């Protein structure tokens, strides 16, 4: 069996990580995978993994920051993009097309329909959730409003994030040695991670700064690359900025608590590491995803004004939060294989 995976974005962020994990899951079951990225994408994640890809047009469309006007504009770009996708699908003669999030989901879905091939969409945005379910089977990631209701719309089912190999099996000693490289780090203190994923949003910086000013009894870590230049100019001197790291699986086994935005694959990787979480809500474009409702009992959610209090609450309720995180860890780690089988079953 051969599959084409159509991926939105630049080939280096969270969407690409999700796509790569889907590819690994499919290949483990004997499926040959071809990759399609936007022609302008540097594809650094795939390059690092030694992968090649096909270049087509995959407009950024319907992301969480999308407005009605930008979504309409993106829809026109989609029209030409889907015909180019159809040509690639026919040329490769694949058995199934998997579109991953936003523009990737839509281009893959419509392209597959035009080429007369079955498709599966991984959806997570307002626009892909409107278009893709009308054309093929869809799997909604936890941020989607469709994740919790008992009766889902036709063609939409749930999926957790497919996770990378090694998640949940990191080595805390490796993380400790890395952290010791910072003169600010004190291994006798508890350690709290602040992160909004690969890109650092202003809200998570504010949260780290506020807590650093409130207490000096913890190591406060900040991970990621700033979304905009200048975001780190006012970073509190007591915050340890690690930048973008490739040893996150090790770090998650060392730290005592994670303060994350209420979305994204990092949240589930943290749960897979059996670690309690405080989610800082409405950081990314003001959106609210109710992750505490999806992963009940493992997450405390907070706004910026209550964050310091909720961090201390998380330590007070640590044992109960950890017990529930352990419960979700097993399901999270099984998702990659389970989702791959569901995709294969669409063809069968």
Language-model-detected regions and their locations in the chain:
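C-terminal alpha-helical cap of glycosyltransferases
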Residues: 317, 331-348
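Nucleotide-sugar donor-binding and catalytic loop/hinge architecture
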Residues: 1-2, 171-193
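Conserved nucleotide-sugar phosphate-binding/catalytic loop shared by glycosyltransferases and other
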Residues: 5-12, 24-77, 84, 240, ...
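Donor-nucleotide binding loops and adjacent catalytic segments primarily
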Residues: 185-252
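Acidic donor-binding loop of glycosyltransferase active sites
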Residues: 94-96, 253-262
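Active-site-proximal region of nucleotide-activated glycan assembly enzymes
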Residues: 117-174
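Conserved donor-nucleotide binding/catalytic region of nucleotide-linked donor-dependent transferases
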Residues: 304, 312-328
């Amino acid at each position: 069996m051969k599959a084409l995976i159509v991926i939105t974005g630049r080939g280096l962020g969270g969407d690409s990580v999700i796509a790569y994990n889907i590819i690994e899951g499919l290949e483990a079951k004997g499926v040959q995978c071809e990759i399609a990225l936007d022609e302008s994408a540097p594809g650094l994640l795939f390059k690092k993994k030694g992968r090649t890809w096909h270049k087509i047009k995959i407009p950024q469309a319907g992301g969480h920051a999308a407005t009605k006007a930008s979504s309409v504009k993106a829809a026109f770009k989609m029209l030409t993009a889907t015909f180019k996708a159809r040509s690639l699908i026919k040329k490769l003669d694949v058995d199934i097309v998997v579109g991953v999030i936003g523009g990737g989901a839509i281009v893959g879905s419509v392209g597959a329909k035009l080429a007369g091939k079955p498709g599966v969409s991984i959806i997570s945005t307002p626009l892909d959730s409107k278009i893709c379910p009308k054309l093929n089977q869809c799997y909604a990631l936890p941020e989607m409003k469709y994740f919790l209701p008992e009766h889902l719309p036709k063609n939409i089912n749930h999926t957790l994030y497919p996770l990378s190999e090694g998640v949940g099996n990191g080595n805390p000693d490796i993380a400790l040695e890395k952290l010791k490289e910072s003169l600010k780090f004190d291994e006798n203190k508890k350690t709290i991670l602040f992160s909004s994923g690969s890109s650092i949003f202003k809200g998570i910086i504010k949260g780290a700064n506020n807590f650093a000013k409130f207490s000096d009894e913890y190591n406060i870590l900040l991970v990621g690359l700033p979304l905009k230049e200048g975001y780190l100019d006012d970073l509190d001197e007591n915050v340890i900025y690690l930048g973008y790291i490739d040893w996150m699986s090790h770090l998650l086994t060392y730290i005592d608590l994670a303060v994350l935005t209420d979305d994204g694959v990092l949240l589930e990787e943290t749960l897979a590491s059996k670690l309690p979480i405080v989610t800082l809500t409405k950081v990314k474009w003001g959106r609210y995803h109710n992750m505490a409702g999806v992963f009940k009992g493992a997450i405390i959610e907070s706004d910026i004004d209550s964050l310091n209090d909720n961090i201390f609450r998380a330590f007070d309720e640590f044992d109960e939060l950890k017990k529930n995180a352990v419960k979700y860890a097993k399901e999270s780690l099984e998702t990659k294989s389970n989702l791959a089988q569901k995709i294969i079953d669409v063809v069968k």
